[in-house]
Curated annotation (Swiss-Prot):
Pfam families per record: ACCA (PF03255)
Matching PROSITE patterns: COA_CT_CTER
Source species of the chain: Streptococcus equi subsp. zooepidemicus (strain MGCS10565)
Protein name (database record): Acetyl-coenzyme A carboxylase carboxyl transferase subunit alpha
GO cellular component: acetyl-CoA carboxylase complex
Subunit structure: Acetyl-CoA carboxylase is a heterohexamer composed of biotin carboxyl carrier protein (AccB), biotin carboxylase (AccC) and two subunits each of ACCase subunit alpha (AccA) and ACCase subunit beta (AccD).
EC assignment: 2.1.3.15
InterPro entries with a match to the protein in the record: Acetyl_CoA_COase_a_su, ClpP/crotonase-like_dom_sf, COA_CT_C
One Gene Ontology term from the biological process aspect of the record: fatty acid biosynthetic process
Length: 256
């Protein structure tokens, strides 16, 4: 098994910690909030408010299940437009009250069903991209499993984007890439090699800002590492003027 194939397998492992795991272990007094105030509450996106070292923050994540029943309830971590609108509602609330936003991303992509498209899936994702680019509070996005397509990017227009060591971030799935390029989805591993989807490759290209090591560390050590980095980075981001914060976020994405 190649290194990329191993990372792809580990990124999709059902045993990985979920967004709710990180929310409860990194932060204090996490309180989940529900609903997009327009249509429904999408269980594949979770979010709420919490404390990080006595600092109020907004935490949002894409939630996969740990078993079949849970995955059905979470739509296998593929958000509907209601999920993205719920996330945006929480981000605008964070902006109103001056709370930094931290997102945890683990999705193969946004749900591509007919109903989701009819309810404006593309618009919901596009609006998140637009609003996040100008959100007037610090944003940190962390890839904790799969970071697939626009479904992941809709929570990743951030001042800092981090990845755990054994995760992936790509414009589409390797299977989708292989199906388009070679009409053969079984060549996914070969596609993954070409796509540059690993944390190490993306860090080298400047797409992400930090890699959180996993190999050789216990889960508790990884949690403490993320917590420490978040405290330090949020302190630095809050020290910037609003003009500087937004300009640097804009330039970060324009350089691609």
């Amino acid at each position: 098994m190649t290194d990329v194939a191993r990372i792809l397998k580990e990124a999709r492992d059902q045993g990985r910690m979920t967004a709710l795991d990180y929310a409860s272990l990194i932060f204090d007094e996490f309180m989940e909030l529900h609903g997009d105030r327009q249509f429904a509450d999408d269980g594949s996106i979770v979010g709420g408010i919490a404390y990080l070292a006595d600092q109020p923050v907004t935490v949002i994540g894409i939630q996969k299940g740990k078993n079949l029943q849970d995955n059905l309830a979470r739509n296998f971590g593929q958000p509907h437009p209601e999920g993205y609108r719920k996330a945006l509602r929480l981000m605008k609330q964070a902006e109103k009250f001056g709370r930094p936003v931290i997102t945890f991303i683990n999705t193969a992509g946004a749900y591509p069903g007919v109903g989701a498209e009819e309810r404006g899936q593309g618009e919901a994702i596009a609006r998140n991209l637009m609003e996040m680019s100008d959100l007037k509070v610090p944003i940190i996005a962390i890839i904790i499993g799969e970071g697939g397509s626009g479904g992941a990017l809709a929570l990743a227009v951030a001042d800092q984007v981090w990845m755990l060591e054994n995760t992936m971030y790509a414009v589409l799935s390797p299977e989708g890439f292989a199906s388009i390029l070679w009409k053969d989805g079984s060549r996914a591993t070969e596609a993954a090699e070409l796509m540059k989807i690993t944390a190490a490759e993306l860090y080298q290209m400047g797409v992400i800002d930090r890699i959180i090591p996993e190999r050789g560390y216990f889960s508790s050590e990884i949690i403490e590492m993320i917590r420490s980095h978040l405290i330090d980075e949020i302190t630095q981001l809050q020290a910037k003027s609003l003009e500087e914060l937004l300009d640097q976020r804009y330039q970060r994405f324009r350089k691609y």
